[in-house]
């Protein structure tokens, strides 16, 4: 029983540490951006993000910070992480 508890504690510690690692950022432009998006969004399909889901609130502060920018602004003009790319899937 103590061994199982020790293993569970060790696994949870490893998982917590892995989530604390900073994500690597890169710039993605042109074909490289298109291919990366195709690879990341393969199962979901690549759909353009829409602000329609936020339109009913009517308050600008409820919209996400990046709502007015596109993927090129976020990932070509500046480096971005895979999490940012995935938010566009």
From Swiss-Prot:
Pfam families: Insulin (PF00049)
Propeptide positions: 50-68
InterPro entries tied to this protein: Bombyxin, Bombyxin_A, Insulin-like, Insulin-like_sf, Insulin_CS, Insulin_family
SUPFAM superfamilies listed in its UniProt record: Insulin-like
Name of the coding gene: BBXA2
Signal peptide: 1-19
Subunit structure: Heterodimer of a B chain and an A chain linked by two disulfide bonds.
Natural source organism: Bombyx mori (Silk moth)
Keywords, sorted A to Z: Cleavage on pair of basic residues, Disulfide bond, Hormone, Pyrrolidone carboxylic acid, Secreted, Signal
Record carries keyword Secreted: yes
Disulfide-bonded cysteines: 29-76, 41-89, 75-80
Official protein name in the record: Bombyxin A-2
């Amino acid at each position: 029983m103590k061994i199982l508890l020790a293993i569970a504690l060790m696994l949870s510690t490893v998982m917590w540490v892995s989530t604390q690692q900073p994500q690597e950022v890169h710039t993605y432009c042109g074909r490289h951006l298109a291919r990366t998006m195709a690879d990341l969004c393969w199962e979901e399909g690549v759909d353009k993000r829409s602000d329609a889901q936020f339109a009913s609130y009517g308050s600008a502060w409820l919209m996400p910070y990046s709502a007015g920018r596109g993927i090129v602004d976020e990932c070509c003009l500046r480096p971005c992480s895979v999490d940012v790319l995935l938010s566009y899937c």
